[in-house]
Amino acid sequence: DVYKRQLCMAVSGKCYLSLHEMNASANRGACMQICRRAYSVKDKDSNIELDIENQYIMSPKDLKTIHFMNKMMDAGVRVFKIEGRARGPEYVRLVTECYKEAVRAYCNGTFDEKKVAAWDERLRSVFNRGFWDGYYLGQRLGEWSSKYGSGATKKKVYVAKGIKYFDKIGVAEFEMESGNLKVGDEILITGPTTGAVMQTIEEIRVDLKPVDETVKGERFSLKVNEKIRPSDRLYKMEKVQLEKVFE
């Protein structure tokens, strides 16, 4: 049983920070993750405050094992557990897709560095606090996040809501509520039943006519790989300029 997950500084699970500060018990699944914030270290006796290089001293990087899954499967591992509590549907879909592809690649003999690099790039595009190997490969010291929040290379920007889906032709109608969409944009559609649909726009139609772009206030249609529902939310995926890229 091997994990792909966000790591907690309370390895035993006995953490009371969230309960003490926010009245939300981590041990009952309600952790507010205030350990992820920046903290200073102060000696209460001498009133001396330590100047530390990284303020996020209680926020470990996320565990990622996909690049050495072949070694673990060689060793006999047969169950990989993926944790996604408090993560968006796009995180759940993309991470499970990558790890499933890795297992299949190992089984059919096509697991290689090129595929690992592609999986790594995709995993960096959704919520993460940077990645490390855990202690699987002999590392003795932990690695810690260098910023608060996500280090994802992409962000989702809400632009439209679902109106109708035409099953026979696989086309969905949406209404733009902000921003714009262009042919070639990468999009994410989410909903309670739909889950997460991710694809690149190949064609946009407004009043049944092909257009290069649609803007706020317009109704438009496009081919969608899976069924969507009214009130589903459509996001445009945009690249994030990170001040510091997580390793």
Task: For the regions a language model picked out, list residue spans one by one.
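Conserved active-site and cofactor/substrate-binding residues in soluble primary-metabolism enzymes
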Residues: 26, 30, 63-67, 75, ...
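Extended, alpha-helix-rich binding/interface surfaces that flank or overlap catalytic cores
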Residues: 82
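Glycine-rich, positively charged active-site loop/lid region within alpha/beta enzyme cores that binds
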Residues: 11-54
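Active-site mouth loops of central-metabolism enzymes
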Residues: 51-64
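Anionic-ligand-binding alpha/beta catalytic cores of soluble enzymes and soluble regulatory domains
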Residues: 85-161
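Catalytic cores of alpha/beta
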Residues: 10, 17, 64-78, 94-98
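Short, small-residue-biased leader/transition segments that mark boundaries at the very start
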Residues: 2-3
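Beta-strand/loop-dominated core regions that host nucleotide or nucleotide-derived cofactor-binding catalytic loops
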Residues: 146, 152-247
